[in-house]
């Protein structure tokens, strides 16, 4: 029988786990939740139409955990699955754990500490460790270098929202603990296959209070050949451009310091140079005012017609 747990100090936290064809990883992911030094008040797992036996493994791991519930559905995509799980959950805060990642043991305790010390926050993100397909921590390589670059830019310019556009130092939805009020206000995770995490972060900075705890590792992100972000780089680039255009539309000058000085110009120019998305950004900025809501805009921006058009521009003939 399901039983909501409320025995911990601080706010209630639900952990939601979207599962899709990760039978190799799901046991260790769930164990990282069960071994928390400050327990989750509930665990909601949804299998998103997997074709492997990951759901059976998850049920076995959670069998003796009355605060856990597991569901199955037809494949609906990560953003829909996360939204459904959050809708089922009851806590004040939500922590997402993708089924191939791990929480560090003190993640939830640390988030409760931060809320207690600094007051209510709408989103908390921490430091990120990197592991390989076999769960070995990595000290070098492409992903480690990417995270290092992202921190270097943030440390240099001190513009957290613009720095996310440059390189997403939060890395993944697994590194987000956020308030239910933020999720409600955002309209949930948007219909983006690759960048729903970045869009949600942009909204969090625009909407409320964000705590960055980057010097303490909160999660371990698994890098493997089946990471969704590796599927179709041309479509990834379209989604990134759309999210940046939306951030420029909604946040505008708040991406920069109040001074609008030479340092801001340098930071912004470096982001544009690094992303190399000027053609798409200019187009999206031109059409964005025609759409009443960002979900409607994203539906247009990620349509097959537009993706094909941009692909032809980038690779004519």
How should these model regions be labeled?
Residues 1-32:
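N-proximal low-complexity "stem/linker" segments adjacent to membrane-targeting elements
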Residues 2-7, 37, 199, 206, ...:
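C-terminal subregions of glycosyltransferases and related glycan-biosynthesis enzymes
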Residues 31-40:
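Short, acidic, metal-binding catalytic loop of nucleotide-sugar glycosyltransferases
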Residues 47-57, 76, 98:
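A conserved acidic beta->alpha catalytic loop
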Residues 73-89:
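Glycine-rich, basic loop-to-helix element that forms the pyrophosphate-binding segment
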Residues 78, 108-182, 252-259:
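Flexible acidic/His/Gly-enriched loops in nucleotide-sugar-dependent glycosyltransferase catalytic domains
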Residues 94:
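Short aromatic/hydrophobic "clamp" motif used to bind/position activated sugar donors
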Residues 150-243:
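Conserved nucleotide-sugar donor-binding catalytic segment
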């Amino acid at each position: 029988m399901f039983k909501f747990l409320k025995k911990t100090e601080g706010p209630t936290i639900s952990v939601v786990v979207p599962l899709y064809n990760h039978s190799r990883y799901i046991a260790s992911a769930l164990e990282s939740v069960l071994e928390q030094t400050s327990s989750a008040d509930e665990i909601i797992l949804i299998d998103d139409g997997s074709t492997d036996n990951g759901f059976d493994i998850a049920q076995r791991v959670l069998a003796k955990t009355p605060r856990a519930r597991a569901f199955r559905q037809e494949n609906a995509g990560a953003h829909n699955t996360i939204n459904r799980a959050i809708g089922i959950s009851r806590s004040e805060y939500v922590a997402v754990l993708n089924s191939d990642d791990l929480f560090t043991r003190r993640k939830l305790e640390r988030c409760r500490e931060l809320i207690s010390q600094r007051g209510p926050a709408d989103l908390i993100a921490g430091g990120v460790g990197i592991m390989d397909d076999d769960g070995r921590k990595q000290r070098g390589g492409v992903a480690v270098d990417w995270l290092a670059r992202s921190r270097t830019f943030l440390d240099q310019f001190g513009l957290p929202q613009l720095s996310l556009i440059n390189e997403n130092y939060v890395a993944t939805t697994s590194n987000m603990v956020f308030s239910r009020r933020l999720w409600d206000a955002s309209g949930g995770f948007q219909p983006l296959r690759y960048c729903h995490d970045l869009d949600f972060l942009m909204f969090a900075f625009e909407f409320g209070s964000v705590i960055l705890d980057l010097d303490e590792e909160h999660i371990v992100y698994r890098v493997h050949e089946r990471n969704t972000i590796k599927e179709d780089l041309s479509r990834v680039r379209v989604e990134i451009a759309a999210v940046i255009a939306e951030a420029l539309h909604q946040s505008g000058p708040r991406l920069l310091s109040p001074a609008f000085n030479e340092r801001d110009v340098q930071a912004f120019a470096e982001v544009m140079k690094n992303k190399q998305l000027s053609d798409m950004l200019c187009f999206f900025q031109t059409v964005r005012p025609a759409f009443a809501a960002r979900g409607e805009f994203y539906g247009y921006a990620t349509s097959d017609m537009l993706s094909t058009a941009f692909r032809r521009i980038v690779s004519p003939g």
